[in-house]
């Protein structure tokens, strides 16, 4: 299965994601910000980092690059798309997932392990978890506070993917830190599953996000 890993100037989790996709048994390949056609791919991951230095707002400039038009086309073709951290911010900026990720309640970069609850298992990335399972993954961001004007709609549509369990380190509304589109195929998560995918890192909970992509394709 061919999975694209999108690179922007300032991406910094691209190699980690590529590595973990290989461990999961996928055939990952890097894709640059100016690529206009991703038809040959079966799925795409937008990794974390500081695309374009987080100028204006995290994700704002990456959102207007040619590759994001190609991602929209993949979504129309019903192929899975996962955005992690800066990737999640980009997916929110282009409107492929509901709501926004904005400046943390305590407005500084925050890096720590978190406990999370998996709120829906209908996405390709969470299909290997049990609903309401508690997992551990780290967060590392300055602009990760989730907000939506009409949060009840997001809950009612089963679009909440991850919720902080216990401590809510950035002040996200309802502790939400992962959301998906209505189909469930486009998923944006602020915590880093690729940093929780090998025993040596302290958790393997995140690995299921990547194995789930392969399982989804059957
Ligand atoms: N780890 C990351 O992807 C960082 C996300 C983003 N640049 C922020 O600080 O909010």
From Swiss-Prot:
UniProt GO cellular component terms: cytoplasm
Keyword annotations: ATP-binding, Cytoplasm, Glutamine amidotransferase, Hydrolase, Ligase, Nucleotide-binding, Purine biosynthesis
Pathway: Purine metabolism; IMP biosynthesis via de novo pathway; 5-amino-1-(5-phospho-D-ribosyl)imidazole from N(2)-formyl-N(1)-(5-phospho-D-ribosyl)glycinamide: step 1/2
A biological-process GO annotation: 'de novo' IMP biosynthetic process
Any GO MF annotation of the entry: glutaminase activity
Catalysed reactions listed for this entry: N(2)-formyl-N(1)-(5-phospho-beta-D-ribosyl)glycinamide + L-glutamine + ATP + H2O = 2-formamido-N(1)-(5-O-phospho-beta-D-ribosyl)acetamidine + L-glutamate + ADP + phosphate + H(+); L-glutamine + H2O = L-glutamate + NH4(+)
Compartments where found: Cytoplasm
InterPro entries in alphabetical order: Class_I_gatase-like (IPR029062), PRibForGlyAmidine_synth_PurQ (IPR010075)
Active site positions, chain numbering: 85 (nucleophile), 192, 194
UniProt superkingdom: Archaea
Domain Glutamine amidotransferase type-1: from-to ranges: 2-218
Primary localization: cytoplasm
SUPFAM superfamilies the UniProt entry points to: Class I glutamine amidotransferase-like
Protein's UniProt keywords contain Ubl conjugation: no
EC number: 6.3.5.3, 3.5.1.2
Function: Part of the phosphoribosylformylglycinamidine synthase complex involved in the purines biosynthetic pathway. Catalyzes the ATP-dependent conversion of formylglycinamide ribonucleotide (FGAR) and glutamine to yield formylglycinamidine ribonucleotide (FGAM) and glutamate. The FGAM synthase complex is composed of three subunits. PurQ produces an ammonia molecule by converting glutamine to glutamate. PurL transfers the ammonia molecule to FGAR to form FGAM in an ATP-dependent manner.
Subunit structure: Part of the FGAM synthase complex composed of 1 PurL, 1 PurQ and 2 PurS subunits.
HAMAP family from the UniProt entry: PurQ
Name of the protein in question: Phosphoribosylformylglycinamidine synthase subunit PurQ
Species this chain originates from: Methanothermobacter thermautotrophicus (strain ATCC 29096 / DSM 1053 / JCM 10044 / NBRC 100330 / Delta H)
């Amino acid at each position: 299965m061919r999975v694209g890993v999108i690179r922007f100037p300032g991406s910094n989790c691209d190699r980690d994601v590529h590595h973990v996709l290989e461990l999961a048994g996928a055939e990952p390949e890097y894709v640059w910000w100016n690529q206009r056609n991703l038809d040959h791919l079966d799925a795409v991951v937008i990794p974390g980092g500081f695309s374009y230095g987080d100028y204006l707002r995290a994700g704002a400039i990456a959102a207007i690059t040619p590759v994001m038009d190609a991602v929209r086309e993949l979504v129309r073709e019903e192929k899975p798309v996962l955005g992690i951290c800066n990737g999640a911010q980009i997916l929110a900026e282009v409107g492929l997932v509901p709501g926004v990720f904005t400046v943390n309640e305590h407005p500084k970069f925050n890096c720590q392990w978190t406990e999370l609850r998996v709120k829906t298992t209908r996405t390709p990335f969470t299909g290997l978890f049990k609903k309401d399972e508690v997992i551990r993954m780290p967060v590392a961001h300055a602009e990760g506070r989730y907000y939506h004007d009409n949060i009840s709609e997001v809950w009612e549509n089963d679009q909440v993917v991850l919720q902080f369990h216990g401590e809510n380190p950035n002040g996200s509304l309802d502790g939400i830190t992962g959301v998906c589109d209505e189909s469930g195929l486009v998923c944006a998560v602020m915590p880093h599953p690729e940093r929780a995918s090998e025993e040596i890192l302290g958790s393997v909970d995140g690995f299921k996000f990547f194995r789930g992509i392969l399982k989804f394709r059957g």
